């Protein structure tokens, strides 16, 4: 199975890069998007989404599939059931249920199958795909499921053009329609996918991460990162657009969001919008400025900005990691690509600079591999770096393989 082999390779790469994984083993769709699906032999092919949880043969096939998949061994010879890099499983991607009553038994059967296959990790099930349906949520939370999975698309999907207005107010807080269902309050909570769709601004991800933590979420997955080979056309799923090369400001924004999510306590109390655009927890300080299209993080050793800023870090001598687009009091740079400065030792820093990007047209139009929404180019640029440990004079050396730190000597 070439697809499973590729998936094993992906899991290996994620593990090597210290990226933890939640797997959703059952997904109901073909492989043709955006073209029509080809004829395929999958066990879900004869059934609709509703029938997947109604037809006995479809349910039995799911049980066999889960047993086999959990027993499958990755490239390190460890079964999926026991892989320490997999932290949880979400059983079914975006299921559809016609009736609430059978949900508890159906989900419990899936859980029993996973436990019999040796899985001891937390198990999640989607609660939000059905919409605001409290009877379904009650039936789901009456099951033995460990956690419930939500989504968030506050700007909608598939507008087919960019949203230019200020939509920070729409992510000032996360509304959980099932917060009053007592059975659901003991469950773990994850966001299985989220995005500010059709928005090119760089301020949304940190705001969403802040709101997730305030609502008590323990995991959140952005949907979806565009592979560089397709990002010039944004033909993957046109309502989303995120890539370090082609949307550098949004990529830095997601980097900031990760810090916000990890450093903000669950159930943290937040001020109402617009005061929520500036917040702090411990050493973490974040500023969101829609007018300047700027997300800024200052946490002492980290200084990240998604666009040019005149704001200086509070403790410039402590800064050891810089990620930015444009200029700041520490780095003057006129290029449009992202750059990263990381301190390796007291007088040794590593600098990564990515190409400039020029946007050619609205990236959120209909998908097509024939159009080009952005292009990369690498003109000659000047960069001025003002770091205390480097002083006014330092030496640099290009690193051909891109892995070893550039050598510098402060004087």
Task: Describe the residue ranges of each PLM region.
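Active-site mouth of glycoside hydrolases
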Residues: 1-145
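Acidic-and-aromatic substrate-binding clefts and catalytic sites of carbohydrate-active enzymes
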Residues: 29-32, 96-100, 128-134, 156-161, ...
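Conserved beta-strand positions
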Residues: 91, 125, 150, 191-194, ...
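Flexible loop residues that form catalytic
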Residues: 94, 153, 225
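Glycoside hydrolase catalytic-domain groove-lining segments
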Residues: 134-198
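Substrate-binding cleft of secreted/luminal carbohydrate-active enzymes
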Residues: 202-276
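Catalytic cores of secreted or luminal carbohydrate-active enzymes
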Residues: 250-311
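Extended non-globular C-terminal regions
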Residues: 291-411
């Amino acid at each position: 199975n070439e697809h499973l082999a590729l998936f094993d390779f992906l899991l290996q790469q994620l593990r090597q890069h210290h990226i933890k994984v939640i797997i959703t083993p059952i997904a109901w769709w073909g492989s043709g998007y955006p073209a029509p699906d080809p004829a395929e032999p999958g066990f879900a092919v004869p059934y609709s989404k509703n029938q997947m949880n109604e037809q006995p043969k479809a349910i039995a096939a799911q049980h066999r599939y889960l047993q086999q998949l959990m027993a499958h061994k990755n490239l390190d010879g460890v079964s999926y059931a026991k892989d320490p890099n997999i932290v949880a499983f979400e059983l079914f991607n975006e299921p559809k249920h016609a009736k609430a009553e059978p949900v508890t038994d159906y989900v419990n059967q899936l859980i029993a199958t996973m436990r019999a296959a040796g899985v001891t990790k937390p198990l999640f099930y989607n609660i939000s795909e059905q919409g605001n349906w409290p009877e379904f949520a009650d039936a789901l939370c009456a099951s033995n499921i460990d956690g419930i999975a939500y989504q968030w698309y506050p700007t909608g999907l598939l507008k087919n053009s960019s949203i230019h207005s200020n939509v920070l107010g729409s992510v000032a807080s996360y509304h959980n329609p099932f917060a009053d269902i007592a059975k659901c309050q003991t469950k773990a909570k994850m966001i299985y996918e989220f995005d500010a769709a059709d928005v090119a601004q760089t301020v949304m991800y940190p705001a969403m991460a802040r709101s997730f933590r305030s609502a008590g979420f323990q995991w959140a997955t952005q949907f979806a990162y565009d592979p560089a080979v397709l990002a010039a056309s944004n033909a993957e799923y046109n309502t989303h657009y995120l890539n370090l090369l082609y949307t550098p400001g949004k990529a830095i924004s997601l980097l900031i969001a990760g810090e916000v999510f990890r450093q903000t306590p669950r159930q943290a109390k937040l001020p109402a919008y617009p005061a929520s655009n500036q917040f702090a927890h411990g050493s973490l300080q974040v500023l969101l400025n829609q007018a300047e299209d700027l997300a800024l993080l200052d946490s002492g050793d980290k200084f990240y900005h998604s666009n040019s800023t005149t704001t200086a870090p509070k403790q410039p001598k402590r800064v050891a990691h810089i990620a930015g687009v444009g200029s700041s009091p520490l780095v003057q740079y006129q290029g449009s690509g992202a750059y990263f400065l990381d301190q390796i030792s007291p007088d040794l820093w590593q600098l990564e600079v990515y190409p400039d990007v020029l946007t050619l047209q609205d990236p959120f139009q209909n998908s097509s591999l024939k159009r080009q929404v952005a292009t990369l180019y690498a003109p000659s640029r000047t960069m001025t770096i003002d770091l205390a440990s480097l002083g006014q004079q330092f030496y640099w050396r290009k690193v051909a393989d891109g892995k070893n730190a550039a050598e510098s000597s402060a004087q």
